[in-house]
């Protein structure tokens, strides 16, 4: 009788989907933890609203290319003050939407008193430039699954 409503092949397919989903979720949290400030995001959604956070992420996504372009221009011009100012803006904006890795990179860039800062700052700028899109994708994925 059950077979009439739920065939064995349907059952196997459903089990495979559940297993695949659980395997995916086992891999994803490490990405989430490295890239996102999960506690902050959960509190933000609880206090304000998920839609407000999504709107903030969209605003960040639209503004960061300009911040990065200015940061790169300041690197070329060897304008440490300008570089630090742009990195500070990125740090604040990234932190406000829970993008922990970008926030920490920007914090390093904005802190010329760090040991070997001059030797590392270009690498940090390059990493920020390379990773921001991916980090926003991870955040968007997290928000969709929250």
Which residues are covered by each model-predicted region?
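Two-component system phosphorelay core
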Residues: 1-85, 89-146
């Amino acid at each position: 009788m059950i077979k009439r409503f739920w065939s064995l092949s349907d059952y196997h397919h459903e089990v495979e989907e559940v297993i695949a989903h659980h395997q995916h979720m086992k891999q994803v949290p490490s990405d989430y933890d490295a890239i996102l400030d999960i506690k902050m995001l959960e509190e933000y959604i609880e206090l304000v609203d998920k839609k407000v956070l999504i709107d903030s992420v969209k605003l960040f996504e639209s503004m960061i290319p300009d911040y990065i372009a200015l940061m790169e221009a300041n690197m070329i011009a060897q304008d440490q003050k300008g570089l630090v100012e742009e990195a500070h803006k990125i740090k604040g904006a990234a932190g406000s939407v829970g993008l922990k890795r970008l926030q920490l990179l920007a914090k390093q860039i904005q802190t010329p008193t760090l040991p070997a800062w001059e030797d590392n700052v270009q690498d940090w700028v390059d990493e920020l430039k390379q990773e921001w899109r991916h980090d926003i994708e991870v955040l968007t994925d997290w928000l969709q699954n929250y």
